[in-house]
Amino acid sequence: MFKICLWYILKKEHILHKTISRYSETFNCSAFPAHITIEHSLNHQEAHDMRGGDIETYNFYPCGNPIQTTTKFGSDTFYAIEQPLKVLDKVGIYHISLAYRMNKEFQAFELAVIGRIEPILKEDLEICVADCHGEVKDWKVLYK
């Protein structure tokens, strides 16, 4: 789907990993590593080059309520519940996804279940390259 991605991945012990797992059970969808996407739809070389570059790490602050977004892949529709994030007083550049589903829209009552998240501090983040070619359940970190 999203080919090779460059992520800020939350450290293993961060509570958002458990939160995303809980939402995946509640909404009957696949769990995935808690992450903030830096870039997606890269090839291996592009991701490797970017990973080796100078990527700044920030503190991220939740801004507003979670929203549903859609991305079309041919005849399929990818739905995501995303929490917009603010960084350096800028909104709309980054988000953290809390749930994903294919071809089944999230309903208003499902969005209402999503709780507020705490700020994500830069010391809780690592930069990694992830393989996001297939279904969400198959996404995996290639290297940090």
Predicted ranges, named:
Residues M1-K144:
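Histidine-dependent nucleotide/RNA phosphoesterase domain, centered on the 2H-phosphoesterase fold
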